[in-house]
UniProtKB/Swiss-Prot annotation:
Keywords of the record: ATP-binding, Cytoplasm, GTP-binding, Hydrolase, Magnesium, Metal-binding, Nucleotide-binding, Plant defense
Binding, ATP: 34-39, 56-60, 94-97, 230-231, 263-265
Lineage of the species this protein comes from: Eukaryota, Viridiplantae, Streptophyta, Embryophyta, Tracheophyta
Binding-site list for Mg(2+): 38, 58
InterPro entries: ATPase_YchF/OLA1 (IPR004396), Beta-grasp_dom_sf (IPR012675), G_OBG (IPR031167), GTP-bd (IPR006073), P-loop_NTPase (IPR027417), TGS (IPR004095), TGS-like (IPR012676), TGS-like_dom_sf (IPR023192)
Null allele phenotype: Increased tolerance to salinity stress.
GO annotation, cellular component aspect: cytosol; nucleus; plasmodesma
CDD domains for the chain: TGS_YchF_OLA1, YchF
Keyword Hydrolase: yes
Needed cofactors: Mg(2+)
Domain OBG-type G residues, every copy: 25-282
Name by which UniProt lists this protein: Obg-like ATPase 1
Length: 394
């Protein structure tokens, strides 16, 4: 008997992502005191929060939502001229500076670490500039040492957390024969050994079942990281800095996460200028703001994407977790949409832009109906059909 043909739409199976499965995810700005965290936050959000030259001046995490710059959204708004325009946003938390020994409560360590546990990703800000007027908690500027300090503190806190979980599970096993406890214990022991070997959880080759358990722990070293390298304006302009090669080498050796050089001084100066003046200044100095890239990279790092709904009343970005299926995406609009999901009518932004309008997309056969198993892609334009008891279709 010949083998059964594979289903045509069976694509590669993606393994689950580390982290919470939610559309309400946030990223935290983390680093040592006086590296430029609050300056970055102030510039991103244009909020007036303290950024004085004093360790621990940020005690409670400040929160803000920053719009995601997107030419696709701008084009849709220009095309549909809607009454309402709602872009995607990145929720950013400014978290006070960590110091060596934070996992043992040094400085304000326990508070800060709990704030980091509450976010879904990390903007790790590194100071790569020297300035006698801005103190460094370790006196000498050394970004690689700072990298090791922060990553070690997060890892040590994870080791402490996992150790306590192992104790709890072992106690539970004395009272229960639940097989799941044994599975959890074996994973915890494996994770503890991994951490004690100096490796972050996010770089482990975990099985699907492992990831489902790990996601209940919210481990600090499991969170995605984007390294933001704070330079002085001169180094940023000439794209050279004596610390950058060493930072790059360290990052490549430790997982190869994204690095983005920026200049807090330059960004703050731009933010204080009128738009025309800022554009002229950038053109004259052959510079551009790093903020759009920082925002987009942070949004992607925490595994968020968005789809569009578009019409004359409203153009809106709907944020969902990467790997979300059509019914889950529908639920981002309203729970009834998910509960009574019938299908998703989908067109790609690129097709709409190329062909000019919805009827042309349909005529070209590029307007598709997708069912419950469809995995929504970033930039999809979707119209959902649903039916619930006592309701109608949309």
């Amino acid at each position: 008997m010949p083998p059964k043909a594979k289903a045509k739409d069976a694509g590669p199976v993606e393994r689950p992502i580390l982290g919470r499965f939610s559309s309400h995810l946030k990223i935290g700005i983390v680093g040592l005191p006086n590296v430029g965290k609050s300056t970055l936050f102030n510039t991103l959000t244009k909020l007036s929060i303290p950024a004085e030259n004093f360790p621990f001046c940020t005690i409670e995490p400040n929160e803000a939502r920053v719009n995601i710059p997107d030419e696709r959204f701008d084009w849709l708004c220009q095309t549909y001229k809607p009454k309402s325009e709602i872009p995607a946003f990145l929720e950013i938390h400014d978290i006070a500076g960590l110091v060596r020994g934070a996992h043992e409560g040094q400085g304000l360590g326990n508070n800060f670490l709990s704030h980091i546990r509450a976010v879904d990703g990390i903007f790790h800000v590194l100071r790569a500039f020297e300035d006698a007027d801005i103190i460094h908690v370790d006196d000498i500027v050394d970004p690689v040492r700072d990298l090791e300090t922060i990553t070690e503190e997060l890892r040590l806190k994870d080791i402490e957390f996992v150790g306590k979980k192992i104790d709890d599970v072992e106690k539970s096993m004395k009272r229960s024969n639940d097989k799941q406890l044994k599975i959890e214990l074996e994973l915890l022991q494996k994770v503890k050994a991994w951490l004690e070997d100096g490796k972050d959880v996010r770089f482990g080759d975990w099985k699907t079942a492992d990831i489902e358990i790990l996601n209940t722990f919210q481990l600090l070293s499991a969170k995605p990281v984007v390294y933001l390298i704070n330079l002085n304006e001169r180094d940023y302009q000439r794209k050279k800095n004596k610390f950058l090669p060493k930072i790059h080498a360290w990052v490549q050796e430790h997982g190869g996460d994204t690095m983005i050089p920026f200049s807090g001084v330059f960004e703050r100066s731009l933010a204080d200028m009128a738009p025309d003046e800022a554009a002229k200044y950038c053109e004259e100095n052959k510079l551009q703001s790093a903020l759009p890239r920082i925002i987009k990279t942070g949004f992607s790092a925490i595994n968020l994407i968005y789809f569009f709904t578009a019409g004359p009343d409203e153009v809106k970005c709907w944020q969902i977790r990467r790997q979300s299926k059509a019914p889950q995406a529908a639920g981002a609009i309203h729970t009834d949409f998910e509960r009574g999901f019938i299908c998703a009518e989908v067109m790609k932004f690129e097709d709409l832009k190329e062909l000019g309008n919805e009827p042309a997309v349909k005529a070209a056969g590029k307007y598709r109906q997708e069912g419950k198993t469809y995995v929504v892609q970033d930039g999809d334009i979707i119209f959902f059909k649903f039916n619930v008891s006592g309701g109608g279709k949309k």
